[in-house]
């Protein structure tokens, strides 16, 4: 099953085939034709789960959507899922923690948004504490993860920052085990996964100037 969706989460088309890759050209060209017929501009970027880049320099996705000149990027969720191959099991007690830290290696919070949220929470604190100023620790404790996701944007870190942080994360988890002694990471497999995936760090970069968030009330 291959699906194509838009920025609003709507599925524009899908194809179910008996073999991987079959029918994709007709699927993609159908979308190109529909955009052209209604006078809609081609998308600035296409996010994919594979084939984001090529040794020849031209992604197969670019060829499928010809003549569009949209940038092609690798979806971060699918990038992170590739690291599961280097773990002993997804049922390991430390699996969730590893995934959360891996996400933090890829994304950073917009500091202007974070500062705006902190100022709003500071005002709430002072209103409910007779005007007293909260400490930084108290202020941060009032911000829930849900509030931060709702009010603050994230963006991808630079290639070298991602490389450095993921390398540091892997170094920190090599020897971690659960209470039975089961390791979180399979050393040999994870070494190979990381070696291969480093070439895709450029594919995770947000296109310059592209607005990836929709403002809601």
Where are these regions (language model features)?
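Short, flexible coil/linker segments at or flanking structured domains
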Residues: 34, 65-67, 189-192
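Short, charged/polar low-complexity linear motifs in solvent-exposed/disordered segments
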Residues: 29-31, 90, 100-102, 159-162
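Residue-level signal for alpha-helical context at structural boundaries
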Residues: 26-27, 98-101, 120
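Intrinsic-disorder/low-complexity, polar/charged segments
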Residues: 20-24, 56-57, 94, 154, ...
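RNase H-like nuclease fold core
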Residues: 1-46, 52-54, 61
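Acidic/histidine-rich catalytic cores and adjacent linkers
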Residues: 50-51, 107-217
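Conserved beta-strand -> loop -> alpha-helix junction used to position metal-binding or nucleic-acid-contacting
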Residues: 46-114, 125-126, 130
């Amino acid at each position: 099953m291959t699906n194509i969706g838009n920025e609003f989460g709507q599925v524009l088309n899908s194809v179910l085939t008996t073999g991987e890759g079959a029918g994709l050209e007709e699927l993609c060209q159908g979308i190109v034709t529909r955009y052209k017929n209604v006078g809609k501009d081609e998308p600035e970027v296409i996010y994919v789960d594979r084939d984001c880049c090529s040794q020849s320099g031209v992604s197969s996705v670019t060829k499928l959507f010809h003549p569009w000149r949209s940038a092609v990027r690798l979806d971060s969720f699918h990038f992170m899922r590739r690291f599961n191959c280097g773990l002993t099991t997804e049922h390991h007690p430390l699996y969730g923690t590893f995934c959360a830290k891996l996400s933090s290696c890829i994304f950073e919070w917009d500091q202007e948004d974070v500062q705006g949220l902190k100022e709003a929470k500071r005002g709430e604190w002072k209103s409910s504490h007779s005007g007293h100023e909260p400490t930084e620790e108290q202020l941060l404790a009032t911000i829930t993860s849900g509030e931060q996701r709702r009010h603050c944007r994230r963006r991808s870190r630079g290639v070298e920052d991602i490389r450095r942080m993921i390398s540091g994360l892997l170094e920190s988890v090599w020897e971690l085990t659960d209470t039975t002694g089961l390791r979180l990471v399979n050393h040999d497999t994870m070494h190979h996964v990381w070696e291969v995936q480093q070439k895709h760090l450029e594919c995770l970069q947000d296109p310059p100037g592209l607005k990836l968030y929709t403002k809601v009330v």
